[in-house]
Swiss-Prot record:
One of its GO terms (cellular component) is mitochondrion. Its main location: mitochondrion. It is found in: Mitochondrion. It comes from the Eukaryota. GO terms for biological process: meiotic cell cycle. Has a role in meiosis. It comes from Schizosaccharomyces pombe (strain 972 / ATCC 24843) (Fission yeast). Keywords: Meiosis, Mitochondrion. This is Meiotically up-regulated gene 130 protein.
Length: 241
């Protein structure tokens, strides 16, 4: 009889210590390995997408653009610049696929291409290449510079060359600064705070920055310029930092 009460006491005491269902900690112990792997892939995709949306600031100026597309640089007189230089300048657009690789597309539908190494970035109505790509980093998606790094044929190097006072042009490849004293190697990136292209020098300095042109606050399509309108300048101006 005593043993019966002892067993009953142990049972009551033991069940009292079992946590209620609402107190259970969340976990993956009820999921199969396949379900966990599928969820990880979904989380990874969402991380990419969140990063992209942060980078583009998701300011939808054009209803035809998706959340992973964004404004880029401009075409003027068949040459590519980092900011509008005339009212004829045409915006280029990022186009992303599901693998988060990208290419440049002129609004008319033509794609950007480069004729040869160390040539200006130009576009043509019939010939084009998909050599451009955009690397999307998984880590640190929210930083002073966005995860988008421009590449051409798997190389991140471009050169900014001063054509004349106040006029800079972007070339493909890394120019030899000893041979071209007015050219600076750079990597092209997309800044989070605005959707204008910025770049950095190999030592992480930013020797040149680009400003918007005052009389090109509105594009020919009627949509306003993106980014910090307070940074508009009267011409293409280089800033040494």
């Amino acid at each position: 009889m005593i043993c019966k009460y002892i067993y009953l006491a142990i049972f009551v005491f033991g069940t009292a210590r079992i946590p209620k269902p609402s107190a259970c900690l969340p976990g993956d112990f009820w999921k199969t390995k396949q379900e966990i792997e599928v969820q990880k892939k979904i989380d990874e995709f969402n991380q990419y997408r969140i990063s992209a949306l942060w980078s583009m600031v998701s300011k939808m100026e054009d209803p035809t653009l998706s959340g992973l597309d964004g404004r880029y640089i401009v075409v003027d007189q068949n040459q590519l610049y980092l900011s509008p230089i005339s009212k004829k300048s045409e915006k280029l657009i990022f186009r992303f696929n599901l693998n988060h690789r990208g290419y440049l597309e002129v609004k008319s539908g033509f794609r950007a291409f480069i004729e040869n190494k160390y040539s200006p970035l130009v576009f043509h109505a019939t010939s084009w290449t998909n050599g451009f790509s955009i690397d999307v980093q998984k880590t640190n998606p929210i930083s002073s510079y966005t995860p988008f790094v421009m590449q051409y044929l798997n190389s991140p190097w471009f050169s900014a060359c001063r054509v004349e006072s106040g006029n800079w042009q972007v070339f493909v490849g890394r120019m030899n600064m000893n041979e071209h004293e007015h050219c600076y190697p750079m990597s092209l990136i997309m800044k989070r705070e605005d959707t204008w292209l910025r770049y950095y020098h190999k030592n992480n300095r930013n020797p040149i920055d680009w400003k918007l042109v005052q009389d090109c606050a509105m594009w020919p399509d009627g949509y306003p310029g993106t980014g910090r309108e307070s940074e508009k300048g009267s011409n293409l101006e280089a800033i040494t930092r």
